[in-house]
């Protein structure tokens, strides 16, 4: 059985999110995007392996689906705690950019919820033993769309704003 829990000492993105408190200052981390991309790759790898075993023991496969959903939830939490505050600070003075960021963030929330809902639908299909392949395809598409959108829009925006703000602080 897969274990998705990582040590905080491992430096993984999930460890960073687990150690945050209300008093933790959120700062730009140039390595965070790479960590998140690595975590997304691991999630995709695990889901692809799971998809090849859909005809196996439904209880085990369902547990693996739940583990994938938990990993996606932790990735989403990391993004919400570490990426979005940096981006929000970067667009705070520009009302148009702020509105576009809110729209982008709502869109990403919708994609994440859709992916999680597809994982739930796959778990239900496994329990019922019907339409498992279709549910797995839908979950794979939702997961892929969420990742592609993050890598195309959120992560570059975080890097751009974080590097720009880091440069401004060095000049000052």
Model-derived regions: residue spans:
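Small-residue-biased structural context
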Residues: 1-172
């Amino acid at each position: 059985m897969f274990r998705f829990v990582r040590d905080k000492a491992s430096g993984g993105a999930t460890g960073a999110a687990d150690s945050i408190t209300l008093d933790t200052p959120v700062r730009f981390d140039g390595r965070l995007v790479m960590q998140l991309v690595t975590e997304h790759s691991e999630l995709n790898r695990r889901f692809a392996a799971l998809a090849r075993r859909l005809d196996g023991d439904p209880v085990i496969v369902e547990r693996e689906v739940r583990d994938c959903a938990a990993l996606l939830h932790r990735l989403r939490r990391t993004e919400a705690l570490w990426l979005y505050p940096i981006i929000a600070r970067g667009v705070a003075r520009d009302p148009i950019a702020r509105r576009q960021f809110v729209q982008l963030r709502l869109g990403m929330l919708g994609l994440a919820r859709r992916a999680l809902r597809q994982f739930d639908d796959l778990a239900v299909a496994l329990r019922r033993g019907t339409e498992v392949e279709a549910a797995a395809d839908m979950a794979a598409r939702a997961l892929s769309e969420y990742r592609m959108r993050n890598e195309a829009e959120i992560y570059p925006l975080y890097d751009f704003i974080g590097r720009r703000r880091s440069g401004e602080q060095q000049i000052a």
